[in-house]
Amino acid sequence: LFRSPYTDSPEDIEAARSIYFGFDQPLDNWTWNVAWFNDPVFLGEYPKEGLEKYKEYLPVITKEDMELIHQPLDFMGQNIYNGYWIRAGKDGKPEYVDRTEGFPKTATNWPVTPECLYWGVRFLYERYHLPMYITENGMACHDQIAADGRVHDSNRIDFLDKYIYC
């Protein structure tokens, strides 16, 4: 899941970036770590913080492994749906910002967070320096067939407007 700064302040931007590429998730939720899966492919090495955190679970990673994993690529594709707001706390450490009651959600209770489309692409480009393609985005909603036999889809139209114009 993506991390977006709560405000445009340099402190919040850096807090969001550090959480996005950092290793704040518990070991049983490691699959959502962006740097762990992308750094070897695009930068040619696993993040040191991840190597330390996962060391007892990892096989030996050889130079030959890294040569195979790290190949020249023309672009990066990323699925981007939603994310969390992050701000710099009073102590300077990143902290998650709670969503307000009534925050918009999809039919599957995913939060509608269009700013993650901007910040996700920005953070990924700044780190990996490759053209970005959004390979997947969208929402689940309860489609209703109107009396005219059509699905007017106002929820999805609103969702796409928010994400396209973020």
Per-region residue spans from a language model:
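Active-site region of glycoside hydrolase catalytic domains
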Residues: 2-166
